[in-house]
């Protein structure tokens, strides 16, 4: 049985770049043992009649040594800074790349004082930069958390669904506050036999500190 990752784009799922930030996103998660054909399934909806679907594309590329990438805030296009470009980036269509890694999100906000004024990596840039650099869900988590560690986090509290054809994770992240670079984050793997969801509320209530 061939196992695939299916990413369902509900109406408005991909219009984040051209409109004010949607704080009404919903993610549905189905583990591979909870689906009839053994596929990991995730869906992503913006839950708004004002957002209309757009399909983004980044072609796979090789980049010269020393190349830099401009980061712009995903919702407003405000320039945030530059980061070194990876030597190789993968093909991305929508919210999935050529290796069947997919990333979606929902915003839960959190305490305003935990925002970071000088961070470079906002939630949207984290998604699409990481998709271009990751071959698995676990590599995407490492990429996202390394990026905010090195360049700061420029968004409020977020829940990310991060999946590949074998497993799916929820990564939650919020800034450390004024003058503190990076983010506080936790990632938990969704069991293969589980169905889960998140919609603008933090989902991880207990942190298993002994499970790494």
Regions inferred by a protein language model and the residue ranges of each:
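Bacterial N-terminal signal peptides that target proteins for export
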Residues: 1-9
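Bacterial N-terminal signal peptides
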Residues: 8-17
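Second-shell loop/turn segments in exported
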Residues: 115-117, 125-134
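A contiguous strand-loop segment
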Residues: 25-123, 143-212
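Sec/Tat signal peptide C-region and signal peptidase I cleavage site
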Residues: 18-24
């Amino acid at each position: 049985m061939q196992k695939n990752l299916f990413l369902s784009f509900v109406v408005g799922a991909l219009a984040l770049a051209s409109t004010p930030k949607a704080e009404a996103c919903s993610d549905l998660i189905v583990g591979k043992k909870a689906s009839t054909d053994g596929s990991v399934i995730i869906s992503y909806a913006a839950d708004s009649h004002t957002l209309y679907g757009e399909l983004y594309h980044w072609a796979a590329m090789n980049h010269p040594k020393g190349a830099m990438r401009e980061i712009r805030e995903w919702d407003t296009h405000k320039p945030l800074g530059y980061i070194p470009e990876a030597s190789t980036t993968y093909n991305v269509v929508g919210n999935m790349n050529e290796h069947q890694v997919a990333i979606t999100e929902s915003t839960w906000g959190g305490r305003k004082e935990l925002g970071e004024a000088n961070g470079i990596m906002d939630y949207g840039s984290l998604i699409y930069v990481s998709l271009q650099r990751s071959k698995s869900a676990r590599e995407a988590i490492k990429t996202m958390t390394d990026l905010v560690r090195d360049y700061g986090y420029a968004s409020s509290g977020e829940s990310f669904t991060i999946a590949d054809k074998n497993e799916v994770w929820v990564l939650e992240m919020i800034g450390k506050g004024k003058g503190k670079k990076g983010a506080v984050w936790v990632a938990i793997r969704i069991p293969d036999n589980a169905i889960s969801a998140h919609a603008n509320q933090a989902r991880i209530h207990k942190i298993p500190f002994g499970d790494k």
